[in-house]
Amino acid sequence: WENDMDFSQFVIMFKSIYLEGFSRPQNGVRTVINLLLEKYKQVGGELRLGAGVKSIDVENSVVTGVTLDSGERIFANKVISSIGLPETMNISSEKADAPVTGNMSFTETILFFDQKPDDAGIRETIIFYNDDEKYHYQRPQTLCDYRSAVLCFPNNFDHDDYDEGIIRVTFIANFDQWNELDRPTYIQMKKEVRDQALALTAKLFPKFQANLLYHDVFTPKTITRYTGHFQGAVYGTTQKARDGRTGIRNLFICGTDQGFLGIVGAMLSGISMANLHGLMNGESA
């Protein structure tokens, strides 16, 4: 959604920000992922990396398995997809009406400093910033909307796993505009995003005089490259599949497009859908 939010996601955000507070596991979310991988292997799961799925094979509106980029076919009577609902329907061999692709995408700048934010009295773990009378939660007409941002301070959680000081700055961005740039311009505009992130940090925290050691910037194009999400859509389609079902029998969806929010939400979605449609055999599927 633009300039709006699904009510269930609003509830999650409200509780997280105002009632519970944000948290971060020691060593980051990788700790949780590693525990899940270990459990998956313990119960006999096989993890195949670097094996892209070319198509989801469907016959008579029933899923039969997948075909990999290598041409190998894997037969299965149930498939749970985490690549997004529009992306899932796009590679299904029997085409159906594709859900609307989400418009919301972002840039994120990760800044590494020789001092930690706490050294300058910065105690926050996250700041939602807006420098306009209204908050424009929508895809901008330019590469980025610098009127608002989210600033994160990973060092300020109970467990600080870093030697350097780290600040992450996120701006709302336009996928189409980034996607049209030639390579030299693309690199130059990433530098502009970094400069805007540094300028905002200096504006909000003038006492933070640390030296920048390293930085990295990802854009909507980066999101599409590493996730395959159309339009670099971080929160997926506005047409969520709450029960995980698609229009194809025994083809299920998990992750953001099933309706949960964030990294932890996506993992909980996978667990819920695997339990419901796999272990519990949620028939009427």
Regions found by a protein language model. Give the residues of each.
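A glycine-rich dinucleotide-binding beta-alpha-beta segment and adjacent secondary-structure elements
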Residues: W1-E2, I12, V150, K203-F260
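C-terminal segments that line or cap access tunnels to active or ligand-binding sites in enzymes
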Residues: Q115-F218
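Mid-domain catalytic core of redox enzymes
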Residues: K54-Y162
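Active-site-proximal substrate-binding core of FAD-dependent oxidoreductases
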Residues: V58, L279-A285
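A conserved FAD-binding loop/helix module that cradles the flavin
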Residues: R245, T256-N281
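Hydrophobic, well-ordered secondary-structure elements that form the walls
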Residues: I80, V169, T201, G255, ...
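Beta-rich nucleic-acid/ligand-interaction surfaces
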Residues: E46-L47, A51-T64, L68, V217-T227
